[in-house]
A protein has these predicted regions:
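Structured, contiguous alpha/beta core segments that scaffold functional sites
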Residues: 2-193, 197, 209
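C-terminal helix-loop subdomains that flank or include functional centers
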Residues: 39-45, 163-302
């Protein structure tokens, strides 16, 4: 379950995940000489594109034969970002047989070779929203820095304790409970920052659009449940559960669980740990928690 959770997180972040099946020697001391190695998609040599021997071809590090079947994956020995940590490491990719690599990604169109991160459709909107939020924060900080403005014709008189900045400009400060007498002609005008209305509503609208682009509900994306009731949150969760069930039964079970199970059984039978008879497996996905079990049961009965 831990490997599956890590794979799904990588699917969300990077759009795809590689699982390399490694067979081990008997002297490694493993009950079954088989291990799984999870690899980030950065291990795949995306610059490897062109023709391959035997009439095949390579697209972004994935090699196909003449019939379009996946034949090999061109992988770096280490993560490209960690080459500097290993003196002997090289950025020369090597082909790994496709039978030893599970390439997991959500296919959105026929002929798709690589996965797409979930947040790719909204990445520009997220950047713009972050810039707007930063600009709003800077505006608030600037407004908070100006407490009052002193007007008058006498520049020598000060109000309160006076200091100077690096350029010699006078800066005065206020203290709690301070009482100060003004000289004739002096006046103090306190800053009244203008309120930028609609900030919260604008953020909600943008986050709604981002949630729709990702394929989630606003509540699941933000964790804000202040505007929902039982019916609305249940309706939103129904669509989310349908998507998760499709991910479980159309991607994880056929693309990960079943191939790993078959390789595990074959390896165990090869070393005599299991009988040679066929062994089947049934898959059970984690159940979804009910928002309100009593209301859910009543709704199912009706």
């Amino acid at each position: 379950s831990g490997l599956q959770a890590l794979i799904v997180r990588t699917l969300v972040e990077s759009g795809e995940c590689l699982v390399r099946i490694r067979e081990r020697r008997a002297e490694d001391g493993l009950p079954v000489p088989l291990q799984l190695q999870l690899l980030e998609p950065d291990h795949l040599d995306a610059s490897k594109t062109g023709e391959a021997p035997g009439g095949g071809f390579i697209i972004q590090g994935v090699e196909f034969d003449a019939l379009g079947r996946r034949r090999a994956y061109w992988l770096y020995p280490v993560h490209p970002g960690e080459v500097a940590m290993f003196r002997r490491a090289s950025l020369t990719s090597q082909p790994v047989p496709a039978s030893s690599v599970l390439h997991l990604f959500d296919r959105l169109r026929p002929g798709q070779v690589r996965g797409v991160p979930w947040f790719a459709p909204v990445i520009l909107k997220l950047r713009d929203l972050d810039d707007y939020d930063d600009a709003e924060l800077v505006r608030k900080k600037i407004e908070a820095c100006f407490a009052a403005f002193v007007t008058g014709s006498d520049d020598e008189e000060t109000l309160g304790r006076a200091t100077s900045d690096a350029d010699g400009r006078r800066i005065e400060s206020f203290e709690p409970g301070m009482i100060e007498y003004l000289a004739p002609g002096k006046d103090v005008k306190f800053a009244t920052p203008s309120h930028a209305g609609g900030y919260g509503e604008y953020m909600r609208v943008q986050l709604h659009a981002i949630a729709a682009g990702v394929g989630l509900t606003y509540e699941l994306l933000t964790g804000d449940l202040s505007q929902v009731n039982y019916s609305s949150i249940r309706a939103g969760l129904i669509e989310f559960r349908r998507r998760m069930e499709a991910l479980q039964w159309q991607l994880l079970v056929p693309g990960l669980c079943r191939p790993v199970w078959q390789r595990f059984i074959a390896t165990s039978q090869a070393i005599g740990a299991l009988p040679a008879d066929p062994i089947d497996a049934e898959w059970t996905a984690p159940r979804f928690e009910a928002v309100d079990p009593l209301k859910d049961i009543q709704a199912d009965i009706l």
